[in-house]
Amino acid sequence: MGNIRETFFKKTCSEEIQLVLASASPRRLALLAQIGLDPHQVYATNIDETPKLREHPANLAKRLAKEKALKAQETFLWCNQNGKSNASAQKIVILAADTVVAVGRVILPKPESEDQAYECLRFLSGRSHKVYGAVCALNECGKITVKLVESRVRFRRLTSSLMEAYLNSGEWEGKAGGYAIQGKASAFVVHIAGSYSNVVGLPLAETMDLLTAYQYPLLSNWVAKTL
C-alpha cells in the first residue's frame, strides 16, 4: 500500500478534479445538490465514532470528519489498486463531515432505539444545545484541512404526547441528537443562531470556502440551463 500511496499522491494531471464524498448520508447529498454539486463518487465510511474520555464535542466532530476523509482515501486507493477505478491519474478532493449535538459537554448519541431517542428529546426539551459541524477536505497531494462550525438551537418544551408522536414517525433514526431539523422536528425549534445547513448536516458556506481553496470549480455548475 505504501508504494501505491506514494505513486497516487505524486501524480498530477490537468483533467477535471473529482469530488469524492466520504458519506452516504442523503441529507449531505441533498445539501450539496443545493449548491450545484454532484459528487463523482460516494463512499460510506465505517469508523468508530465513540468519543474519547473527556473529549470536547468540537474536538470529536473535527476528529471524526478527518478520520472519515482518511478512511475514504484508503478505500479510493484500494479500489484503484484492484482495478475498480480508472481515476489513478485524477486530481481529487475528498469531502467528509461530521455532526455532533451536545448540551454543554454532554454529547448526545445517534440513538439506536426509541428509548435512546426519547432520552435525547427529553434532555433537549426546553433547552438550548449546540450543534458542532466539522467539514474536512483532503486532496491527492495529501493536503488536509478541517473547518468547524457551531450553531445554537433552542427547543420548546416537549410534551409526552409530542415526543411519542415524533418517536412513532421514525424520523429520529440515524440522526445526531435524535432529531432532524429539516423535518417534523422543525416545529420544536424556537430559536436558532448560526448556520442552518450545519444543523441539517453540512455547513454550506464553509464547504464552499474549502472547495474554493482546493481549486474545485464549484461555480462552473452555477449556469442557467436553457430549454
Swiss-Prot record:
The keyword Cell cycle does not apply. Gene3D superfamilies: 3.90.950.10. Its EC number is 3.6.1.9. One of its GO terms (biological process) is nucleotide metabolic process. Keywords: Cytoplasm, Hydrolase, Nucleotide metabolism. GO terms for molecular function: dTTP diphosphatase activity; UTP diphosphatase activity. The record marks R27, T99, Q182 as: Important for substrate specificity. One of its GO terms (cellular component) is cytoplasm. The keyword Hydrolase applies. Pfam families: Maf. It is found in: Cytoplasm. The active site is at D98. Belongs to the Maf family. YhdE subfamily. Nucleoside triphosphate pyrophosphatase that hydrolyzes dTTP and UTP. May have a dual role in cell division arrest and in preventing the incorporation of modified nucleotides into cellular nucleic acids. This is dTTP/UTP pyrophosphatase. It comes from Bartonella quintana (strain Toulouse) (Rochalimaea quintana). The lineage of its organism: Bacteria, Pseudomonadati, Pseudomonadota, Alphaproteobacteria, Hyphomicrobiales.
